[in-house]
Curated annotation (Swiss-Prot):
Mg(2+) binds at residues 96, 230, 232, 234. GO terms for biological process: carbohydrate metabolic process; peptidoglycan biosynthetic process; UDP-N-acetylglucosamine biosynthetic process. This is Phosphoglucosamine mutase. Binds 1 Mg(2+) ion per subunit. Keywords: Isomerase, Magnesium, Metal-binding, Phosphoprotein. It comes from the Bacteria. Pfam families: PGM_PMM_I, PGM_PMM_II, PGM_PMM_III, PGM_PMM_IV. It is an enzyme of class 5 (isomerase). Its EC number is 5.4.2.10. The gene is glmM. Activated by phosphorylation. The keyword Membrane does not apply.
Length: 429
């Protein structure tokens, strides 16, 4: 059986175990065969394994005659923007929100994550194990000006946004946004309070960032609004002036209304996933906005956006795509767009967020085993019975970890807990 290397967000694993320098070198060679004698832009987050993987994948690419432009530490959306500007391929070495021992390889082309068909083409070459011999050898060059190009592009997008006097708190997750976020907010006039801005590769996402938003909610002192990013900068979660966490669903709801009022919300449509909270769906419906759902993963959100013509979509986790700003989830751009909506309305973030219901939702991870099956009659009965009583049940394999995720949503938290435990017992039996 052919090995599946790519998950929902590139290749990912624990460095030295499921993700090695040898694999990265081969990915470089496989991608190099597809690229030909072009160039590939490479960026990374702050993980300690980033240097080693960067060297390995660069060696694979240059051995196939491809020039490699090294950006150093830079958010995933920044690399995506650079590949769009230069019409080239890109590689980001990052495991996004995962702990420091993980790392990953994301492949981009012309601003977008590569499609499943191209991932399959790379996997096929990895499985075959034999690569073309090229007479031309590529070069590795520093491309640190890529950071300035990205910052310049973001500032141009928000040239009319004046944040003078605004107090903003940022949690940079000790990750890639340490190179961009503070500078952009300060340039726009904000007074910035920063947490977790170390580039020590052992601290990324550790008790901080978008997967631990309570850290910022508890620690921010001066901010009227806070933003907490993940390790590679493609997610953001907000914190309001009352120190309440504002999740991705609520951010999407606020942006949807703001864009609609400006006449910028295409087809009055927003794209979410099967995990999008029903409270957001009900709120959008009241505002005359349609919600389309798709599979979990920002690549699938983007596919549905392109298919439907929507220009706003995202996930509860904070992956939010504003297509007339960026071709991928960009935490910094999302944060600035939210600030723009707040400034334009004159309202507080808490006032907006409270308007959007957030129905109780519990997610539990169950370690996946070979004998575990989702095609189970008892499981089907539980789901059908729960659904008939108004609960929404989603059971799916994670695209980035060896677990099955159980999510149940409804209006009675105690009943949700019972349903989650019942499903867990069936899966583990």
């Amino acid at each position: 059986m052919r090995v599946k290397y790519f998950g929902t967000d590139g290749i990912r694993g624990i460095f030295g175990e499921t993700l090695t320098d040898e694999l990265a070198f081969k990915v470089g060679k496989a991608l190099g065969e597809i690229v030909g004698e072009g160039k590939v832009i490479v960026g990374k987050d702050t993980r300690v394994s980033g240097d080693s993987l960067e060297a390995a994948i660069s060696a694979g690419l240059t051995s196939m005659g491809v020039d490699v432009l090294l950006c150093g530490i830079l958010p995933t959306p920044a690399v995506a923007l650079l590949t769009r500007i230069t019409r080239s391929f890109g590689v980001v070495i990052s495991a996004s929100h995962n702990p420091p021992e993980y790392n990953g390889i994301k492949v981009l082309k012309g601003g977008y994550k590569i499609p499943d068909e191209m991932e399959a083409e790379i996997e096929k070459r990895l499985e075959n194990g034999s690569f073309l011999t090229r007479s031309v050898v590529g070069r590795t060059k520093s491309f640190r000006e890529g950071r300035d190009m990205y910052i310049g592009a973001v500032l141009e997008m928000f040239r009319d946004l004046d944040l003078t006097g605004e107090m903003v708190s940022l949690d940079l997750a000790n990750g890639a946004t340490t190179t961009t976020a503070r500078e952009v907010f300060e340039f726009l006039g904000a007074k910035v309070e920063v947490f977790n801005d170390s580039q020590d590769g052992l601290l990324i996402n550790q008790g901080c960032g978008a997967t631990h938003p309570r850290f910022l909610a508890e620690e921010m002192k001066n901010g009227k609004v806070g933003f907490t990013f993940d390790g590679d900068g493609d997610r953001v979660i907000a914190v309001d002036e009352e120190r309440n966490v504002v999740n991705g669903d609520r951010i999407i709801g606020i942006l949807a209304v703001g864009l609609k009022e400006e006449g910028r919300l295409n087809s009055d449509t927003v794209v979410g996933t099967v995990m999008t909270n029903g409270g957001l769906e009900d709120f959008l419906k009241e505002k005359g906005i349609r919600l389309l759902r798709t599979k979990v993963g920002d690549k699938y959100v983007l596919e549905k956006m392109l298919e439907s013509g929507a220009n706003l979509g995202g996930e509860r986790s904070g992956h939010i795509i504003i297509l007339d700003r960026s071709t991928t989830g960009d935490g910094l751009i999302t944060a600035l767009e939210l600030m723009r909506v707040l400034k334009r309305s004159g309202r507080k973030l808490s006032d907006f967020a409270k308007e959007i219901p957030d129905y109780p939702q519990i997610t539990k991870n169950v370690r996946r085993t070979e004998r575990m099956s989702l095609e189970n009659e008892n499981l089907r009965k539980i789901v059908e019975e729960s659904t008939s009583r108004g609960y929404r049940v989603v059971i799916r394999p994670s695209g980035t970890e060896p677990v099955i995720r159980i999510t149940v949503e409804g209006k009675d938290r105690e009943e949700i807990e019972k349903i989650v435990e019942e499903i867990s017992r069936v899966l583990e039996s």
